[in-house]
Amino acid sequence: MNHEPKKECFKTSVGGQALMEGIMMRGPEHICCAVRKPDGTIETKIEDTPKHGIWAKIPLVRGAISMIESLITGYRYMMYSAQVSMGDEYDAEEEESAFEKWVGDHLGKKAEDIMLAAAAVIGGLFAILLFTVLPTVLVGGLNHLVPLNRWAKVVLEAVLKVAIFLTYMAAISRMKEIHRVFEYHGAEHKTIACYEAGDPLTVENVRKYTRFHPRCGTSFLILVVIVSVFLYSVLPWSSTSLRVVFKLLLLPLVMGISYELLKWCGRSDNIATRIIRQPGLWVQRLTVFEPDDSMIEVAIAAVTPVLPEDPEDGKW
């Protein structure tokens, strides 16, 4: 009986982000944002991919840089997609706050960069407060009521962190607008999987692939949660406020380790990497849903312009 050798699936660095009625895809040289307009047509916007020089090549350091850059870029394209998808209903002057108008009047072209950076900082601070500070404060408060030993506090803090993260993801996925974004998330994953398998990018081909992908932002976030649990377990509990300070100082290292694990799991397929990436695949059931064909069309429109002529140039 003949057995054909199993074809190794190509792993690409091309990836993206789901938006409001659209998708942003990022390749080695270009970024393309494709958004479904109210009239049913697809609008695309293509820009050069930002370069970060040597810093983007240093292990552990590149993880924090990638996270910050993704927050800023992602927010910018999310705002753009909201504007395009709303069409004539979007009123830039109405949406602009007094503060934004003041910044625009006084800083001109720098205003957008400042507002995007500020939005990214606010979003980052919210995530830090919710997933890093809150569990520690809750355990510290409980410890004043019911004295706990060190490992009881470590375990309880870990359980609270995971519970808060999963509850937050489950809650926002029930919002109608966010649920559609998560459906576009599925279209993004399916399209990348189709490309990596070497199939032509058609709706029929893309539709048959899984919506789950190991190299996903959700997988990175769950890795951050898991790595932080282990790394923070060695920190002292003598003072709740001091523990919070130590956790904040170690956060760039947590992101760096998580990013390197994601890179490793993306390149290798063995028992260890399958175990490490499995929690991320489980959590994707909360953040990635099956798309319809119109969403797949948008994903194809977004990824096609950013694919390198030589696939090796975009190898993971």
Question: What do the PLM-derived regions correspond to, one by one?
Answer:
Residues 3-15, 19, 23-25, 151-162, ...:
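Polar-ligand-bearing catalytic/cofactor-coordination segments
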Residues 1-94:
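Divalent-cation
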Residues 49-50, 54, 67, 71-96, ...:
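Multi-pass alpha-helical transmembrane bundle typical of ion/small-solute transporters
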Residues 123-148, 224-248, 252-255, 259:
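Juxtamembrane "helix exit" motif at the C-terminal ends of alpha-helical transmembrane segments
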Residues 74, 81, 131, 135, ...:
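Alpha-helical transmembrane segments of polytopic integral membrane proteins
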Residues 2-14, 18, 100-137, 141-145:
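Cytosolic-side membrane-entry/anchor segment at the start of a transmembrane helix
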Residues 111-129, 209-234:
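Transmembrane alpha-helical segments and their cytosolic interface motifs
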Residues 101-110, 137-156, 235-245, 264-274, ...:
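Membrane interface segments of multi-pass transport proteins and intramembrane proteases
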